Structure formats: C-alpha cells, structure tokens
Amino acid sequence: MSALGSGDSNHGNSSGLDPLNSYLSLPILISSKNEIEATGIPSQKTTAQQAAVFLLDSGMVGETAPMVQLFMQKMKEEGFRSMLKNQFIKHTDACVDDFLKGDVKSLFRNTKQLSKVVLNHFKPMIPKKFHQLWALGIESNAFYLKLCGSGGGGYILGFTENIDRAKKALKGHKIEVVYTF
C-alpha cells in the first residue's frame, strides 16, 4: 500500500496522487516518500516568443498494464536501473527545480536531456508513429517531449521555448497549450 492510497487497479496499487491533485487544484511536489506538499508555479507571462507546456494527443488509447510490465522487466537490468538513477531521475529533478525557480534557460537544457533519455531508453513506451517526431523536436530545438503516465498512447507532454515555432513543427497534430511562461 502506498502512502496516499491503496486503490487496486489493473497495474497494482494507486498512489492516490491524481485524485489529490484534482481535489486541491494545485501542483503537488513530492520531495520524498514522506514529504508531499502542494506548491506554487511561476506566474504566467505574455512575451513575443512565449515558452509553453502543451499536451500532444497521440490519438491512441494507451494500455497501462503492458507498459508497466515492460518497465518492471527492464528494472531487472542493472544498466537500466543505473540509467534511471543517474540520468532520468537526475534530469527530472533538475527540470522541476529549474521550473520552480523560474530558470528557463536551464529548464530547457535539462528538458532536452530528459527528452533524449526517454527516447533512447523508453522507446517501446512511445507510440511508434511518434519516434521520428520526438527526434525532430530534439534535433531542431523546436520542442521536447516527455511521456505522460505509463506511455503507450494517450497524451504526451511537450515543452517549447517558442509555441509558434512548435505549432509549425507539429502541424497536423492535435496539441493543447496548458501553460505559458
């Protein structure tokens, strides 16, 4: 049972974070297993070249159970566990810190690295039709993508320093801007 809930589902126990987040209508910062708090985010700004966080609709329904099974299988590999600790968690934590501090330059540097790590090590969890698009974002610096949840479909989280440039690069794809700064 997790610290926040024990709702059984097809992939194990629920953390209860999604309902808590919905109830509070605030971002939640998880510092450790026992340190969970509501937090603020930097205020939104209107600039000529607006940075943004967006959702990219994959148009596919992702099934959680196979993605979790794949992840658990990969966790048996020492190299994967090492990458998770030394790259994935490192860049994820840096992105959160940069975002909360408002350090946009560092945020996008770390987001690019995180996007590369996900593409290189979580590729089976990314819908195949998005592999090239994911790489294009990294190579062009127009946008960077990150899996939402277990992957396999649903929404993909996107970050861009220039939303107009990202929209052009993502033409033909359904995106929804959720935050600008």
Where would I find each of the regions flagged by the language model?
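C-terminal nucleotide
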Residues: A3-N13, L17-S150, L157-F181
